[in-house]
Amino acid sequence: MDEPSTALSTREIENLFEIMRQLKKDGVSFIYISHKMPELFEICDTYYVLRDGKLVAYGRFDGIDENGITEQMIGRQLADDDFSNHVCVANDQVAMSVKNLTGQGFTDISFDLHQGEILAITGLQGSGRDAVADALFGVIPYTGTVVVNGKTMRPGSISGFMRNQVAMVPRMRKERGIHNDLSIYDNLYMAYLNTKFKRLLIKKSDMDQRFGRQKEALAIKTENAKNPITSLSGGNQQKVILGKWLEADADILLFDNPTQGIDVGTKFEIYHLILKLAKAGKAVIVFSQEFPELYKVADKCLVLYKGRINATLGRDELTEKNVMYYSTGANLEVEKHA
């Protein structure tokens, strides 16, 4: 079973696991392929770890913890990836100001995003999180205002957001983030050509230099840049998507479920890249419902519930308990019965 829970809700995953347990009792065996560590520990008995196409470790889940598995997958000690000391590097300059943003699935969303800041926006499925992400890249219409570097954006205009230095690394990477029929090379410099290129003719040596720079900086693993983008792993595809926006020199980057469906090692690389972008003065918004992801990178977190901001959590308030409390609207029930 290859990533069977990717498009399932929590309830549906529980139902799937119950069916698997029953089939196991009947003598059915499973090979379960997933990047979601909690699922593996819940449903699997034994594990095999592959890295760079080779078997590097195997054993039983009852003899190891998540850190041990992760270290085997990435090939290094997790002590090198301690995000607990993350310090906000934001300045006072507002990169994006959102006021009373309202559209299908969300209402009255307002916040300021500063240069060097990493803002997380989270919420359960149906909270409006995905729709807000789309609105902030001009994918869907909205009312209210979005001001980018002092300029008011036109709702529903992707090209307008792109021209004003807003970039998106989208969810559903294969459907929305890459051009499946084009090569790795062509995918990487596409945003640059659309937003920055002013000449009539393309200078191949310039494009080669740009590709080489991003390939090295992002550690994109490919034998041939002319291979189709679909020949890459999910993690390397995600790096290409990020690389094309870095080449376009975007000021504001929207990461919508940035590590969905990629391996643990590449996840850590993406987290470090996000922190590096913030240190370089970029403004970043990360849309995710995975708490470990939020905790690793966020300076501040907006928690959505039924399309509205239910809480704004600072770094010192960002705990899994608080995120779930406000994501489920539990605070509203407490207020109702107070």
Where are these regions (language model features)?
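Glycine-rich phosphate-binding loops of nucleotide-dependent enzymes
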Residues: 1-338
